[in-house]
Amino acid sequence: MQIHSGRFKGLRIKTVKNAPYRPTTSIVRKSLFDILKNISGKNMLDLFSGSGIIGFEALSRGAKTITFVDSSLRVNSLLKMNSILFKEEEINFFKNDVFKFLKSCDSFDYIFADPPYKFNEIDRLIPQAISCLNDDGIFILESSPQEYSISPYRVNEYGDTQLTFWKKN
């Protein structure tokens, strides 16, 4: 996978065959960062991190810090290996259950979540993620197209992928 924009444009991050995740497609990633616009100096939380491409792209585009949370040891090992390419960047790693992490986390400017396909606790995830946002923060959920119990302020669809956005305020 390749970084599309910013200081690390063109840099390739390693992925694994038969990975326990599905990376965000190039088109969805470009659209996400076009929507967010300037993320310079912001801190971002990447839940269900998988390949980490969203967090690494955010760093390349000027994010101040990225925090990866994934419960898989294999995923965390790959994230740490890829982070070596991003020298001197502030990157945090947590091998943890997302809900346990959200109970005690700091606040973030952006929280991105791309849960597994058959994840059935999205309605539980949304309010917990929103509660960990800074006052003007945005929570972004990547999923298959669907509706949620908490109304978002924006929804963008890309074939069988949907980006749904919630603001704290």
Region locations from a protein language model:
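Class I S-adenosyl-L-methionine-dependent methyltransferase catalytic core
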Residues: 1-169
